[in-house]
Amino acid sequence: MNEIVVKGARVHNLKNITVRIPKNRLVVITGVSGSGKSSLAMDTIYAEGQRRYLESLSTYARQFLGNLKKPDVDEIEGLSPAIAIDQKTVSHNPRSTVGTVTEIYDYLRVLYARIGKAHCPECGRPLEKKSIDEILQDLFNSFKEGSRIYILAPVATEKKGTFKKEIEEFISKGFARIEIDGEIYRLEEVPELDKNKRHTVKLVVDRLILETRNEHRILDSLELAMREGKGFVEIRNVDTGESKIFSENLMCPVCGIGFPEITPKLFSFNSPYGACPNCHGLGFTFEVDPSLVIDEEKSVLEGAIIPYRWDRRLSRWVAREIEKRGVSPHLPFKDLPEDVKEFILYGDDRFEGVVPKVQRWHRETESPEMKEWLEKNFIVQRTCSVCGGRRLNREALSVKINGLNIHEFTELSISEELEFLKNLNLTEREREIVGELLKEIEKRLEFLVDVGLEYLTLSRSATTLSGGESQRIRLATQIGSGLTGVIYVLDEPTIGLHPRDTERLIKTLKKLRDLGNTVIVVEHDEEVIRNADHIIDIGPGGGTNGGRVVFQGTVDELLKNPDSSLTGEYLSGKRKITVNKTRRLPYASLKIKGVRHNNLKNIDVEIPLGVFVCVTGVSGSGKSSLVMETLYPALMNLLHKTKLPAGEFDSIEGHENIDKMIAIDQSPIGRTPRSNPATYTKVFDEIRSLFAMTPAAKARGYNKSRFSFNLKGGRCEACQGQGYVKIEMLFLPDVYVECDVCKGKRYNRETLEITYKGKNISDILDMTVDEALEFFKNIPSIKRTLQVLHDVGLGYVKLGQPATTLSGGEAQRIKLASELRKRDTGRTLYILDEPTVGLHFEDVRKLVEVLHRLVDRGNTVIVIEHNLDVIKNADHIIDLGPEGGKEGGYIVATGTPEEIAKNPHSYTGRFLKNVL
């Protein structure tokens, strides 16, 4: 069968649709936000492919995997095993790096174990172990036959002592001579040694001529010398004075440091064998920051010790202790004597100070909430003082290939690593050992280059990757695995990609297809849509207005019949996102000087205020480093007196021209299903107040807290207002089952009896934003927030949709709506990180209107963006580059979109030309 046929799909908002998908083709599913693209691709095709694959496993294997629910679909024909590559699975494990996620690091560990050269961790001397036979071979290769040689056993190197005991032992064993500090003595004639001076002592095991006929004697003497020299032997050519030291163990002849056996495990920072003993392979340690636990202005009794504020007994106890030292506990902390401050912070033998106490709480608590509270308020991550952030122990870091240890290698960018491997000088034997291994590493690195990630390093922590980067890493890993006959489902792989890199990504997707796979991509990017073999357009609107197939066929068919869908109208040029031709002029500017965070090259950036600013540049050029990691925390610390860690810079000028700062990124709006769009935007407070004002609620004496699913009283106690019950499966992932008592409605029966216009509180949470907007159109306080949610393109989202099920783009737009509903000051600076993620052309148009509205009120909007429709609407562009990683971090161009389009050095300008 050469196609996948989906019949009667009804998952979420899909309207019983039937779709035919050609196999072994690149298929793009597109449509406005919330139209049902992911419902078809992820929740129907992928979910059923996965479920059928798991059903084919044995009952024994299935018990560990749990039961996957069958999607609501009549049937799917021609399905193969499916692999999903989505945006949500950015790793939160601090041990994961780009190297471990792509499995390249596993290959590197083998490479270093096989051909790495060990060095002494103390003195850096190369270490090598050789068998007796190899030493013999080496002697004949290094010295001329007929040379006079001494075979010596090193006894001590630069050590104090008289060595009387050793000398007596050597006499009893029948040895004749010994070398002390370069002089050879007969053992019976050794002078008295000064025990306070350092001596180098070597036992002379044999003196002979290097000849083939002496081979057996040499072998015996070498063995004897190894035994006496504890694994070391020195051969000296008496004629030339040249010496060679050999060892049968990896051990330093000077420092006497033994070296563990070199295995791949030695290079794993997740194994106690290779990890740094201090940070256990994390590269950082959690430490209590003394400045965060103390409020200097207050006295101990007024609550100067912040972690003790929730238990005043602790503060009173500290007050008594300092009174014993003759100091008043009513003095502000800053006025206390230094020794008392030290005592409060670090304690003594009897008294546990605040810092060790908080450190102990963090170490011993089993409550994730407590741990999170401590980390958020009092604890900072510090680079490990032992390994310097390198994660490995010193032995692992002393093994080198061409002068680089494994950490130094992973610190290179991927393009530099490829260069390094291609220029490796290896012997014939080494090539034989690692030839295939090198090919595999190079192949996997090339796949990362193909998906536009050549600027990353393998040591980069996976937790710092954006959703788009982590998705493309997993895409590269899949190509590396070389599977065929599989259905790949990708969710917006172009996130975070500059138009320049999209072309390479499309080639990669086609490579995946040409291996014999069906590649289904949920995508809004014009280039990807134009390169598809087959297009499925879902719509026409979002939420209840979506869920239908408005078009399926090839690009050419869509362009011939553009009126069939919104996508067709935009692709054919019938509809366009207009350009705001009159560029606004700034009322002032903000200057940040000497920025050198990550790859930024000590740049000075001027940001005009009161206008719409776009920060652009290829992936890895330094956009997030500049805006999210330096400018945002630095301004927050100045304006709102926070203590956020900011990237390195020299100074900021002009911040007095703004009075409020709001950053909106793609992090989740909450980590638990209790958080949802209604609670996050605070519209739920208004709705609960409205329900409390109904006659029935007043008659029963219900206030607004009765309608909260987080508080006792109105909620269903069986599931504590969650609507489902979590069943812990011990070593399996937790399973969530609908609550038997409230049937998923979250509230008890009495609360659900209160209705407003025929709907109870649970029905309201089940409405989409657009449905609620119509329902509450006469209540201004509620309508205002819902209108903003609608304006940012979230009309299809349910008010009670758990935060855990929202995509990064949706979470960001909910945050944007939450800020837009507040009254701005007209001097607010808004920062947005790729707000167009997950948006169709039509949604981008709405978003641009919202951003213009903000700027028209006098505010400043800074957007990090790759979408040309947004960039062309900016008043001012700051283009970073020219490349990603080490080749980036410079300002390539600044100015209006028209000025950038004329700049020959700007990649962004080249693409802007075509849309202005």
Swiss-Prot record:
Main location: cytoplasm
Protein's GO biological process: nucleotide-excision repair; SOS response
Signal peptide: none
Protein name: UvrABC system protein A
Record-linked SUPFAM superfamilies: P-loop containing nucleoside triphosphate hydrolases
Record lineage: Bacteria, Thermotogati, Thermotogota, Thermotogae, Thermotogales
Residues bound to ATP: 31-38, 617-624
Compartment annotation: Cytoplasm
Pfam families per UniProt: UvrA_DNA-bind (PF17755), UvrA_inter (PF17760)
Function per UniProt: The UvrABC repair system catalyzes the recognition and processing of DNA lesions. UvrA is an ATPase and a DNA-binding protein. A damage recognition complex composed of 2 UvrA and 2 UvrB subunits scans DNA for abnormalities. When the presence of a lesion has been verified by UvrB, the UvrA molecules dissociate.
SMART domains: AAA (SM00382)
An example Gene Ontology molecular-function term: excinuclease ABC activity
GO cellular component: cytoplasm; excinuclease repair complex
KW Transit peptide (keyword) present: no
Subunit (UniProt): Forms a heterotetramer with UvrB during the search for lesions.
Gene3D superfamilies with a match to the protein in the record: ABC transporter ATPase domain-like (1.10.8.280), ABC transporter ATPase like domain (1.20.1580.10), ATP-grasp fold, A domain (3.30.1490.20), P-loop containing nucleotide triphosphate hydrolases (3.40.50.300)
Keywords: ATP-binding, Cytoplasm, DNA damage, DNA excision, DNA repair, DNA-binding, Excision nuclease, Metal-binding, Nucleotide-binding, Repeat, SOS response, Zinc, Zinc-finger
PANTHER family attached to this UniProt entry: UVRABC SYSTEM PROTEIN A (PTHR43152:SF3)
Zinc finger (C4-type): 252-279, 716-742
Assigned protein family: Belongs to the ABC transporter superfamily. UvrA family.
InterPro entries from the UniProt entry: AAA+_ATPase (IPR003593), ABC_transporter-like_ATP-bd (IPR003439), ABC_transporter-like_CS (IPR017871), ATP_grasp_subdomain_1 (IPR013815), P-loop_NTPase (IPR027417), UvrA (IPR004602), UvrA_DNA-bd (IPR041552), UvrA_inter (IPR041102)
